[in-house]
């Protein structure tokens, strides 16, 4: 399976997960803002690469686990950018979550990704 195919599986798993969740619209917007902010998706990609190297046939459940890795990573980035930590203004060329949605919402968004 090619890299782009693996990444597409992860993106699909992320979209499906957040499409099924019952969040307040403001929380959903904050979470998706950071999930869609870009990034290389290296952690989920590496998981799928390891599975493939072990000759495991990639299934939707594997993509869900890979997506969970990306969610945890994104949540940690949101929390890392908070004023009490690094107080960053920008991440991946965009306003950080707390600069766009406020500190309280960023904390909730980061927590929701865990």
Regions from the PLM with identified roles:
Residues 15-114:
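Mg2+-dependent prenyl diphosphate-binding active-site environment of isoprenoid biosynthetic enzymes
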């Amino acid at each position: 399976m090619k890299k782009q195919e693996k990444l597409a599986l992860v993106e699909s798993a992320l979209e499906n997960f957040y499409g099924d969740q019952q969040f307040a619209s403001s929380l959903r917007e904050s979470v998706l803002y950071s999930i869609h902010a870009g990034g290389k998706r290296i952690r989920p990609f590496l998981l799928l690469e390891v599975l493939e190297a072990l000759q495991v046939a990639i299934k939707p459940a594997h993509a869900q686990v890979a997506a969970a890795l990306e969610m945890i990573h994104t949540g940690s980035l949101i929390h890392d950018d908070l004023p009490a930590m690094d107080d960053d203004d920008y991440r991946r060329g965009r306003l950080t979550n707390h600069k766009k949605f406020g500190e309280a919402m960023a904390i909730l968004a980061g927590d929701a990704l865990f």
